[in-house]
A protein has these predicted regions:
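Conserved AMP-binding/adenylation subdomain of ANL enzymes
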Residues: 191-206, 213-279, 283-288
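Gly/Ser/Thr-rich phosphate-binding loop
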Residues: 252-256, 264-335, 431
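AMP-binding/adenylate-forming catalytic core of the ANL superfamily
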Residues: 88, 105, 360, 366, ...
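Conserved C-terminal "lid"/linker of ANL adenylate-forming enzymes
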Residues: 407, 432-435, 440, 472-514
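Structural core segment of the AMP-binding/adenylate-forming
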Residues: 6, 76-147, 440, 450
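Conserved AMP-binding/adenylate-forming core of the ANL superfamily
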Residues: 20-64, 68-72, 89-94, 144-149, ...
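Conserved pre-ATP/AMP-binding loop-to-beta segment of ANL
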Residues: 15-18, 130, 150-172, 179, ...
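Conserved AMP-binding A3 loop
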Residues: 30-34, 168-194
């Protein structure tokens, strides 16, 4: 099965169903599956006519209908799409364009200031298409998306179907530690993941897409899986506008990372008890939201219970870019709070020294031009996830830490900091916490929840006293080696990657971030 087959089947089934909705200022615009497919085909044929068959083509931009049409135009033909993080600085984007050997680029209008730098510093880059219909005063080698599509419309030849083992896309990991790696995913990797994920939606089901589109989680679960079921993908134009856009698009389903769920809950919890939960849910969620799928970090089951009070079911899953990306997920029919669900039917799971190992049709081909890193991650056909976990008697998977984050104390005891962090984070005064290993034991580095600090008018000494009292209670229930012996109260939030994960290598830096 190829992504092209999945998309063509969707157009046959759902041709006049609305595929995409988005905001243009205050107006909601929309396109049907048939309309989207026309642009996908003209893009694909245009790329073939321009000689980009078998080439790597980068995309830089936030979620837009032009972005997804261009991406699908690339991967349904015989080229490889390289979606890049639009939030990265110019010099890092230049590095990734060059490291991925990209010879063409689709670029959002917001990134036009980077254009000269790309042309000057990316020697393999032959052509750039701006992700807008009409553009003026473009330098040599730069065109509008309409010019490429017009060429495709007039071209007689269409690209042949790609091979199932051809590289469809190269997705760069966030690089929270060390150099980011380009994950090579084949046509079969993506298609098998789309088919194996057990999510059912009726045609026209509204899905509000709020995650960055270059993420494998967003790209595969929102767009490819959503399109396979005839869903209507609604584009969130900004995280700042997410709650407003929920009331506009009235989604049935959403994908979120835990941090978003926690942020929304704070808004719910801040409302007075006199407001009925049904009224509050209508105001915050838009009135139709039934399910939130989440992954990417630990979510405390507390939030699952709280959201259920508002009629919203939260289902956790587990995955990584290297697995296209989903490995396991909870479903509306089969779920267990605290778990990350049962493994998909197309993957095998085993454990080696507590580490989760994965094998299956969704597992990547390797890291682009990084043979040593590929060999280290893929051993005897098994992908070493770097996550520690276990499976219960009902077949549900649980994670309890990262292998590389393991703290080895001087007495030889091993501690997974995430297990402790998840417990400490339950305190309302704790906004962010990282546990580090020091010479004298474990230290909790905590950034206080500013809303609580302000509401209770806490000064620095009061914050320290309350947190220390909380740690004292925690320590009483723990063996000696798991007790917190040090407390550092931060003035600023931790530095995060563009995927909103705390960069553990930078936890000692406590400075305001731009």
């Amino acid at each position: 099965m190829l992504i092209r087959n999945i998309l063509e089947e969707s157009v046959q089934k759902f041709g006049e169903v609305k595929a995409v909705k988005w905001l243009n200022r205050k107006e909601v615009l929309e396109k049907s599956y048939s309309e989207v497919m026309k642009n996908v085909i003209s893009t694909r044929k245009g790329l073939l006519a321009e000689g980009f068959e078998g080439k790597h083509i980068a995309l830089i931009g936030t979620s837009s209908v032009e972005w997804i049409e261009s991406y699908l135009g690339i991967i349904t033909g015989c080229a490889t799409a390289v979606p890049l993080d639009a939030a990265l600085p110019c010099e890092e984007l230049i590095d990734l364009i060059n490291r991925s050997d990209s010879e063409a680029l689709f670029l959002s209008p917001k990134h036009r200031p980077y254009l000269e730098a790309f042309l000057a510093n990316c020697p393999k880059l032959q052509k750039v298409w701006m992700l807008q219909k009409e553009v003026e005063d473009l330098p040599s080698g730069v065109y509008s998306i309409n010019e490429l599509r017009d060429m495709g419309k007039s071209a007689a030849e269409d690209a042949s179907c790609p091979d199932a083992e051809a590289i469809a896309t190269i997705i760069f990991t966030s690089g929270t530690t060390g150099k980011s790696k380009g994950v090579m995913l084949t046509q079969n990797n993506l298609a098998s993941n789309v088919e194996a994920v057990k999510i059912s939606a009726e045609p026209g089901t509204a899905m509000l897409s709020v995650l960055p589109i270059h993420h494998a989680f967003c790209l595969v679960m929102d767009w490819l899986k959503g399109f396979s079921q005839g869903a209507t993908i609604c584009i969130n134009d900004s995280l700042l506008h997410m709650v407003r856009n929920m009331s506009i698009f009235k989604p049935d389903i959403m994908l979120m990372v835990p941090m978003m769920i926690e942020t929304i809950y704070k808004r719910l919890a801040a409302a007075g008890p006199e407001i009925p939960k049904a009224v509050l849910a209508e105001k915050v969620f838009g009135g139709k939201l039934q399910t939130i799928f989440t992954g990417g970090a630990h979510l405390d089951p507390y939030y699952i219970d709280r959201f259920a009070e508002y009629g919203v079911q939260i289902l956790e899953g587990y995955g990584m870019s290297e697995c296209s990306p989903v490995i396991s997920n909870n479903t509306p029919e089969n779920h267990k709070p605290g778990s990350i669900g049962r493994p998909l039917e197309n993957v095998e799971i085993k454990f080696e020294n507590g580490e989760i190992l994965v094998k299956g049709t969704s597992v990547m081909k390797g890291y682009y031009q990084m043979p040593d890193e590929t060999a280290e991650t893929l051993k005897d056909g098994w992908l070493h996830t770097g996550d520690k976990g276990y499976m219960d008697e009902d077949g549900y998977l649980f994670i309890n830490g990262r292998v590389k984050n393991l703290i080895i104390l001087s007495n030889g005891e091993n501690v997974s900091p995430e297990e402790i962090e998840n417990k400490l984070a339950l305190n309302p005064l704790v906004a962010e916490v990282i546990v580090t290993g020091e010479e004298n034991g474990l230290t909790a580095r905590i950034y206080p929840e500013q809303a609580v600090v302000e509401a209770k008018a806490l000064d620095t000494e009061m914050i320290r006293l309350q947190l220390q009292a909380f740690l004292d209670v925690y320590n009483k229930s723990q063996p000696t080696y798991r007790r917190i012996t040090g407390l550092v109260i931060r003035k600023n939030p931790f530095i995060r990657s563009t995927t909103k994960k705390i960069r553990r290598q930078d936890v000692l830096i406590d400075e305001p971030q731009a």
